[in-house]
Amino acid sequence: MQCIKFLLVAVGCILSFSSYSQQGHASVSGVIKDSDGQPVPGAVVVLKNTHQGTQTSADGAYKLDNLAPGNYILLISSIGYTGDSVALTLRENQQLVYNSALASDHGGLDVVTVTGKTEQEKIKESGFSVNSIDVTRLANTTADLNQVLNRTSGVRVREQGGVGSDFNFSINGLSGKQVRVFVDGIPLDVFGSAMSLNNVPVNLAERIDVYKGVVPVNLGADAMGGAVNMITNQKIKRYLDASYSYGSFNTHRAAFTGQYTHEKTGIVLRSSFFYNYSDNNYMMRNNPDYDVEIRTVENGQFVNKDSRRFHDRYQSGMGQIELGVMNKKWADVLFVGFSSSFYTQQLQTGFRQDNVIGNNTKKGESFTGTLRYRKDNIVKGLNFNAFVSRSRDRYDITDTSFVKYYWDGNSMPSAVTELLNNEKTITDISRPRTFGRVNLSYELNPNHSFNLNYTLDHTRNHNYNRLTADEDDIPGLLQKHVGGLAYQQELLKKRLTNTFFGKFYGLNLEQKHWVSSEGGYVKQKDFVTNYGYGIATRLRILRDLGIRASYEYTYRLQETEELFGNGINVIGNPNLKPESSNNINVGAFYGIKNEKHKLFIEVGGFYRDAKDFIFALADVRSSQMIYENKSNVRITGVEGEIKYNYKTLISFILNATYQRAINTTKFTGPESSVPEATYMKRIPNQPWFFSNAELNIGKDNLLGRNTRIQLNWYSQYIHWFYLNWENFGYVGGKSDVPTQLIHSASLTYSIKKGTYNISLECRNIMDAFAYDNYRLQKPGRSFSVKLRYFIK
């Protein structure tokens, strides 16, 4: 059946290949500056009476390519400047350069009104279901990337505590390892376990693209649930961005990123650093209404009362340097890089907060070397992109105390350790990793293009108890091969876009198994291959109205933690199988804008039919969990988002998501006739309705020339959901996570066109009870201040 589906997609791809002429196409590019010679970012550049348009980058640069030869009128517009227009004649294969200097509009002169599209708008209007977030507008806030993404439709980030805590990331109901995270198309975890969405500051990103369910070939991953791709700033030749923030619970955050380009030689130096520290000593509040009891000991008696967290300190840091060249005949990009990261994390609880921990600490470090290369137009229309890295990620967990702690810090002797082991352990986990990615893209003509991608991910897993062994005698091996081929066509004068693709998944696995006849562990090798395929299409009905649909049959291969465990609270499962899913997205979008107003409305529906669904099964008697396969899980849902901007004064965002994830496994086993007790019941510990609202009000030059003051308000609503299976227990005693409504706000003042910035922020203004993954309590009201310096 799978082969037939794959052949149908391939045949459709071949039949839809129209024989358009391969006429040479032209381009026009340049830089837009003001009368003082400073770049004008965000200027709209379009070709009159066409759909071709863009906005200038942070350094004022723009480019319009894939243009047919002919006569055009180029229109340039930016708020606060007089417009510019020029007649152009483009010849076949011509690469025209047109630079413009815009004069300030002090007298309210008539401005040419044009409507180009930003990079975010272009991505959102593609055939894929994707959210594209402009992170630069949040650079002055103290948010990390998790908090930014948690305000996006279809996305839920469930944290286990404060800064640096473990979290579960979900897109349209699929979560955890089913969602892949990238930075500039490279898996984020290549750079070590200290690199995570919950500790990377917003300053390090320019844009974030969130792909839902159906993932393009060029990312090259087994991302069954979707993917997050963080795009860094690579357009500005020289810049420096440095920030520091201090907040409640003794929280410190520092970040630095910059780039220097030597004009004559083309040598480029890039660097990024960040550091996070927090005591995370927020108050744990007793709430018996929801079976959340904070148990302490007073005079030999158990007493439930509010207590402060006492063993949750977290610190992490990362440094990265890249040196290379750009815009050479033999390389458009060539960089050699090195990065190092570390973290120290005290453990305060297991996955349930009544399991209090007071001695265990997790420490880790990683070192990564990278090489990246890109060359466009090796031959006409053929682009080559390659990345390779070698890294070593290591961490250890100490669990040697036979005690049980309570929330006031008191402890009592116990028969087991804090992580419920029967013996003392210092677990040492080391994972040497080699990662490689090669991408070829070929543009046959402006309407037909191909993309070929291949990734190799080779990871060793060394896991042993330092108190009883010197090394892992039988280390595990996880080697992934993911390949993909895509063909994209644009028809009906680019009103219709179709992308057909196929993917290959190969898994080479080596792990130890206990064999009684051998009297010990032996190495077992397995190699499994699977194939996926899909299509994404977008039809623009009107200039501002379009519909889209996408489908993918995809696989997600097992991860090292799921197979080998993490040494803390995850038990390895060597019998775990890959999971697969049929993913469908449908949606529509409508967007209009002029020089004052901008409105974008988006609605969509999604369907996920997962087989061998990998599910984290928690043991209610302990603090441990194990990943297992559920035969069938079906997820359906709808989502919508509205965005409105009035000039640079006001912007408003409102989104909501409803999803239903149910277990569709009828019987307890493949050969069993015993009914599954949870058949057609909701998957537990997953929110099913949530909504976000954001209001931003800002004014330029209110407190002086080249200044801006801005107020941001955020609200988030999460409807209650079951912690365990909904049909277990009696009606009055079902365990659930309560409904929550959380408000946060920030105030930012910027001077000298954003060179100097100061922000004040308050999260959870109403000090409401906040719960998340497995009903773990999150911080209450908190305050912070951030200083940021940016120059280019």
Language-model regions, residue ranges each:
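Gram-negative outer-membrane beta-barrel transporters
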Residues: 601, 605-609, 628-722
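Extracytoplasmic beta-strand/coil segments of soluble accessory domains associated
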Residues: 130, 146-187
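Face-selective signature of the C-terminal outer-membrane beta-barrel domain
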Residues: 320-343, 362-552, 596-605, 653-655
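A beta-strand signature from Gram-negative outer-membrane beta-barrel systems
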Residues: 202-241
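Short acidic/polar hinge/loop motifs at secondary-structure boundaries
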Residues: 65-66, 186-213
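C-terminal beta-signal and adjacent terminal beta-strands/loops
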Residues: 4, 606-612, 713-792
